[in-house]
Amino acid sequence: MKLRSVLLAGLFGASTAASGQMLSPDGYGKIRFGQQLGAVERQLGQRAAPRTADPACSMVTFKRYPDVRFMVENGVITRADANRIVRNSAGITARMSVKEAQRHRPALLVGPHKYDENGQYLTLAQGTDKALIFEASKGKLQRMRAGLKPAVEYVETCG
């Protein structure tokens, strides 16, 4: 019985820790945009994967943060991408429609999607150099990214 309790506590603790992270224009978890990749690896005690193939621009992941990929440009983490709506500083959830997100955050700027004729980008700028961007299709939020400009504004990723 004790072993079962320990296993359940471990599972729920890990789940809570992972879901407790928040994506913002400043960073994700312990990672801050603008940090050197090497410094982040030392801070987290783990290496990014895969090893950066192109020093100019690569996408990497950390085991600690399985829901997010990080853009590294010239050794600096500039952006994070999530293939779903994760907990974020805007308080926007996956259950919200585009219209609900706009009501929740009136400062969201809505623009057309580059590839999806039924899609939109919803951008919440933070100052002149950072942003949180949501992608939507047919009125439903699909994925998101955050980071430093201009990297966060790139439609495509790298690597």
Task: Report residues per predicted region.
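N-terminal signal peptide c-region/cleavage motif recognized by signal peptidases
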Residues: 14-17
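A cross-family detector of function-defining hotspots
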Residues: 20-21, 35-76, 94-141, 146-151
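Short, solvent-exposed mixed-charge patches
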Residues: 157-159
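Bacterial N-terminal signal peptides that target proteins for export
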Residues: 1-7
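Second-shell loop/turn segments in exported
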Residues: 25-30, 85-92
